[in-house]
Amino acid sequence: MQQQQQPSIDQLPEPTASTSNSATTKPTIATATTSTTTTSGNNFHQQLQATTAATMQRLRTTFTRSRTPTGAEMKMQNSLEVPKQVRSASFDEMQLESQRASSSLLKQQSSSSASADERSSEAGFLQVPLAAHQQRSHSFDSATASAGSDDSGTFLEVPRRLKARRSSSTKTPPPCIHCHYLEEYERRMTAEQRYFIDHRELTALSYSNTSSEASEDEDEVEGHNAEEEEEGSAAIEDAEEETTEAATEEADEDPRTEVESEHDHDPDDDAALEMDIRIGNMSQGSSIEESRARLPRQMRRHTIGSSSVTSASEDEGLEGSDNGSPHFGNTLLPPQPTTPCGITFTLSPTNGDYPSPPHLPLDPGSPPISPCSSNSGRLPALAPIISTPCSSADADDAGAAMGLPVRARRRSISRQEAIFVEPTGNSLENVSHEEVDNSNTKSSVDTADSLDEASTMATCGSPGAAGGSGASSSHHNAFVVRDIYLMVPDLKRDRAASVDSCFSKLSSNAKTEELQPSADGCFLTVPNINATRSRSVDIVLPTDEQARYKALSMTGSTVTYADGRTASASNSRRPIRIVPDWTENAVQGEHYWKPTSASGDLCCLNEECIKSGQRMKCSACQLVAHHNCIPFVNEKSTLACKPTYRDVGIRQYREQTTTHHHWVHRKLEKGKCKQCGKFFPMKQAVQSKLFGSKEIVALACAWCHEIYHNKEACFNQAKIGEECRLGNYAPIIVPPSWIVKLPTKGNFKSSIRVSNKNNAASGSGGGGAGGGAGGGGGKSKKQTQRRQKGKEEKKEPRAFIVKPIPSPEVIPVIVFINPKSGGNQGHKLLGKFQHLLNPRQVFDLTQGGPKMGLDMFRKAPNLRVLACGGDGTVGWVLSVLDQIQPPLQPAPAVGVLPLGTGNDLARALGWGGGYTDEPIGKILREIGMSQCVLMDRWRVKVTPNDDVTDDHVDRSKPNVPLNVINNYFSFGVDAHIALEFHEAREAHPERFNSRLRNKMYYGQMGGKDLILRQYRNLSQWVTLECDGQDFTGKLRDAGCHAVLFLNIPSYGGGTHPWNDSFGASKPSIDDGLMEVVGLTTYQLPMLQAGMHGTCICQCRKARIITKRTIPMQVDGEACRVKPSVIEIELLNKALMLSKRKHGRGDVQVNPLEKMQLHILRVTMQQYEQYHYDKEMLRKLANKLGQIEIESQCDLEHVRNMLNTKFEESISYPKVSQDWCFIDSCTAEHYFRIDRAQEHLHYICDIAIDELYILDHEAATMPQTPDQERSFAAFSQRQAQNERRQMDQAQGRGPGSTDEDLQIGSKPIKVMKWKSPILEQTSDAILLAAQSGDLNMLRALHEQGYSLQSVNKNGQTALHFACKYNHRDIVKYIIASATRRLINMADKELGQTALHIAAEQNRRDICVMLVAAGAHLDTLDSGGNTPMMVAFNKNANEIATYLESKQGTQPVDGWLDD
């Protein structure tokens, strides 16, 4: 095609007024030239300014958006030319054209200069013109349409699969002040960290030129730095010719000044993009390495392409260099030949809008020139050097360190990283290229420092072209691109479409299509940062080559949840939950969705919403999303629900106990702002409902429910990290810090260095084998292991545990809801309670019943239970409280929220006959202010009546449905009506969803029975005895059709059958009496009118004998019972919550009552082997005594109390000073409590009935060289056969009280131990120690005989063991006896055990005694210490040892008891 040539530099027109105006009104391009003082330099700058301004104006006019061609027009198109109206103007093209024009002018200027070596190589910057909203593609604006999107403003959106395309006309919603504060905080923290790292590098930067002239003027430039910056700024802001003249003068004075003046431009100028292109005129003889070395260090660290390796000293302080990585941040690196791509740019031959350079005479119709060929040319290419910081934060820090103003990075026009540039051989290209010296030619990609530069350099030539000498400069090639076109695959479409459509098009086998890369490998490697790209540029157009495709399977994307856990979106998508997950798979921040249809509830995803599926609302945080949008909501941590528990280690759950605000964005809010006190306008609420406004009007805390305007005046930054007080319901809310998630099985990190379970098992097996030599110990051990294994299999693993903080002001309430009660009102109440309380203190009874919740919160102080349902629901909760073992102490008080049909118990307690949509907050406040009362509960025992034969009635049962009476028990016509109702409801549950309809059914059945009179002979079928008195005749006289046993005054939905005027006392729910009432068919319906039944008696015990099958009911649960004998007696009294009324007494319940704990001591050897086996460790532990302590005491206070008891009481054996607590009730293993954290833990955190302490001293006792096993291991091996040996030695039956122990040939009469404190003495202890029989000594000590037994000379068992060198006996006595025994002296010589060991030269025993606290300065009757005794006996080694220990023994020492 015919090419238009640009005029030469001499033919350029003078700048006109219009040109100047356009150059001033629009952002101008200021290009730095060589520092000269001639007048030609000024003219050159003026011409360059005018030319570039005219070029920019043509570009703006050319790339004006217009109509997209139709399908018919696209079919008629035979040219490869891309219509200008189908895509936006590329900034690369603008830079390319300006660079090409500048290159030609600078080349002419350089050829006319006298010497190229004297010119400065300092380059200027090319400013990209301002891109106004109406001058760029509308697709760029769509990226910022959603302010709440994570990628807004960074990349252009390519919608996901099943996601609608974002509308370009959507208005940008106002920003959220809460999100702004969060981003500002994170940005400030990031900037501070990077500034700390880069500050030392920035302060060492040098801006001197390589020429000698620049070096001489360096000091002068630094001295006038501030003045030159002001002049440069003023020069840029001036208009028309004054702008050009000022800029030229400043550039002539100093090349650095223009660079600084350009940076001192208005920081709010939108033309300041994220890239500054430096067009450098490299001096002759210089190389790329020299040019790179002249760059500042901060910029040089991001510049690549040098052939030489950077020295270690140069890059010593640099960071972030990925070893082996193909890129630095977003910087392009040389491509790898094995990763090409098929999407390319093709170069076009024609475009009349661009002026052609005068030095490129191409003949019309000449074949396209390949970029790789070497033709002769006249113009040496200039090497553009682009310096781009890796991030905006780096740029800001670098600018601050260099004294330059900080510019905000334009993120909305970031280049698309999915587009690659490749000059192809079959495309028509208008380029000029000259012969290139292959030895000096570098790849154009080697100097590219950003994506934009890479796109430019791929078509603009080699950077090495500017590095040659003046003589050889004409032999370097330079590729100048005139037009840029797209070469994209032809999908044979009738209209323009995006290339992305081929990726979303599914074939029959559920595969997508992907472009196959070509085999040449000449492509740029783009870093994969998961960025999206524009859809308006990638237009599908016909091309000469057909693209190749391959099948790509649709793999499931990875979903990241709020707590950091990832899962596959297609395979492991989490189900939508209504109630919290209590398993180990629970996720922090999970929502609890329920369907919603309220107007004004908009999806929280805004522009990312796919608008598919039913709208769902989170019950806890009130977030709204479509059903199909929920997986995307789970991906965003900013949309997570309020935290309900703490996912930390079991040793760190007390380190952080505060709860922070959880702010949620609200588009529709009622009420008023807490800060300013103004109500939210109704106009915005109406607009939100009618038009779906996406504006965030309020910020609400999901915990305390405080509401603030989305304004800086109402919501400040301090609210983000502020502690939340949980609002008006703080006393009854369970804080998230109370609920701790336990580590999964196998992930428990014990403090023990080596936990070898196999060794422990082998050790116990050896003991069993040794003990089984006499009588089958191995078999019993196997049976024990089987029993323990069965217990472990039955025990359910726990994933959560509640660690409350005892406080008398806290009254936690756990809620049990039966969703099926009251016409399915429970589903609605479930969400309301989850919104006001912690969702983990609200339980659905259909998800396993109340046992898990009661057992989990058993240690919560002053616990209260709210049962939402009918009377059956309350009875269910009370029955589970009876079954829990060990029972809850104290038992929690139970309140009632009536949702059932009758609700007689709720009426008796003052809570009303049913829930009538009252505010849940009001009910919670009343529960917190309620008073505790006692209620009688009665046991029902049913046995078959063998005196009569079974009448074989259908569906009859041998027992009543419930064995505990809470409300009433009845048999006869009323039970028959209730049974008919239950059977009908089970058959047709849809007919009984209204409370009024249920009552009408009851009335209908009562009227039917009134006519039939089926139970008129009831008194003939039963026998009634109350407190031993027969009342059958009274039933016969009254003609009763039903008999009631009332525990509460209310019956049958609010009636009162008992007449208060009858009887000796007024009925009460805690008087221990039941009211017996007879009812006829006539009286039964008259109860609704206020009448009463026939009062029979008040009794404490009743007995009913039936002779035929009769319907019976217990608390509304009815069934037919066969002939039987029924006995009723008092079971217990339950603690209930009653609505506070004046005159009613409150039961005083002490929620923080004292705990009775057994103290068990464990040695280190036992702990290391059996910390995972609680049963074995409990058997091996040594019982020290019992302590009574308050539950709110922390462990630091408990330690002081125990130390006092250990020192003062003789009943406690010796315990070392460095003992520590063991947590025995948190995890499946025992673990130690750090002494530094004892003030954070409470006694209720680590113990229930038994308090374990770990004695380090017993485990670290000095061992003798010839000792093969410790005492703990020895005692464990003997544990299985001790009882057998004791039974053989005793020779007694299990019921005998005394025994004969045969030691040698002398029978010794001993008495059985009776007192737990005062132990009995016996000579058998001394004989066992003298003979070295450890088994006998242990057996006697366990029977209660004291180790302090002495003979007539005052010698103890320890004296004999030291004298006869029985080390096992000495070790056992030291570990089991008190401190007094170690230092006891005999009456004859006044010697202690240490005297005897030193006298007998027993070094090992001396070491053990000293370690146990034996006194070294005790004198015998001769005035000798143990050391002096050793010297007298020539035991020099022992004497030296004792002498060395005298200075190290503590002053306080071991005090005698």
Curated annotation (Swiss-Prot):
Zinc finger (Phorbol-ester/DAG-type): 591-641, 661-724
SMART domains membership: ANK, C1, DAGKa, DAGKc
Biased composition range(s): Gly residues: 763-778
GO annotation, cellular component aspect: plasma membrane
ANK repeats: 1320-1349, 1353-1382, 1389-1418, 1422-1451
A GO molecular function held by the record: zinc ion binding
KW Repeat (keyword) present: yes
Positions with biased composition (Acidic residues): 214-253
GO BP, one annotated term: negative regulation of opsin-mediated signaling pathway
Tissue expression remark: Expressed specifically in adult eye.
Knockout or disruption consequences: Flies exhibit photoreceptor cells that degenerate within a week after eclosion.
Main location: membrane
Protein name (database record): Eye-specific diacylglycerol kinase
Species assigned in the record: Drosophila melanogaster
Encoding gene, per UniProt annotation: rdgA
